[in-house]
Amino acid sequence: MENLNIVTLTGAGISAESGIPTFRGKDGLWNKFKPEELATPEAFFRNPKLVWEWYDWKRQLIAKAQPNEGHKILTKMEEEFPNFYLITQNVDGLHQRAGSKKVIELHGNIWKVRCVECGNERYEYTTPLPEIPPKCEKCGGLLRPGVVWFGESLPVDALSRAYELSREAHVFIVVGTSGVVYPAAELPFVAKENGAQVIEVNPEETPITKIADMHFKEKASTGLKKVYDYLREKYGSKG
């Protein structure tokens, strides 16, 4: 169905199956820190070396991870349905590594670095980083991770596009997100108010469950397989 708009919102639950921890709780080396103590502009400018050591550790974990079946099913959906879009709260880049092309990153990307002085932004895939904290090759300024920290606004372009897609969605799929981090958590409600069918995939109930037309109470990979089969059966595909 050429004009069927399918929008999917993903959270940490889909990456958990790739072995990426949520970076809360008992993560050994860093468990004495809470993410909200390190992932802030204040923490970064107070101690950029400490914050970068944490991100360097996270980047190394993510580099070893592989996209899982859930990521791959979303890639298949994009290939089959022309108006399929993916909005993610994740910063790990696993959707792109799985082959997804139409990805809107609400919280940035851990593989991006941005200079706090001149604003130059680029991808940096080296792990571990040769220098901590890394410096800008253009001006020598301090580089920061290209992610959204606590207390920062989401990128305006990504957020406005996410709202636009949510308003236009016929089917809105929510996968592995807690439904408590705003403004992302509002998107399924925006879709619902505009007539979309909301499908949730999450082993737990969330604030989104009450508005979901279908809830697959299971992990991302198995739940998404069922959603994929349902969409193909109901709407067919271009092929």
Swiss-Prot record:
Enzyme Commission code(s) on record: 2.3.1.286
Main location: cytoplasm
Localization of this protein: Cytoplasm
PROSITE patterns in alphabetical order: SIRTUIN
Cofactor(s) listed: Zn(2+)
Cellular component GO terms held in the UniProt record: cytoplasm
CDD domains (UniProt xref): SIRT5_Af1_CobB
Cofactor binding notes: Binds 1 zinc ion per subunit.
Molecular function via GO: histone deacetylase activity, NAD-dependent; NAD+ binding; protein-malonyllysine demalonylase activity; protein-succinyllysine desuccinylase activity; zinc ion binding
Keyword presence, Metal-binding: yes
Chain residues that bind NAD(+): 11-30, 89-92, 176-178, 202-204, 220
Family: Belongs to the sirtuin family. Class III subfamily.
HAMAP family to which the protein is assigned, alphabetical: Sirtuin_ClassIII
UniProt cross-references to NCBIfam families, sorted A to Z: PRK00481.1-3 (NF001753)
Entry protein name: NAD-dependent protein deacylase
Species this protein is from: Aquifex aeolicus (strain VF5)
Gene designation: cobB
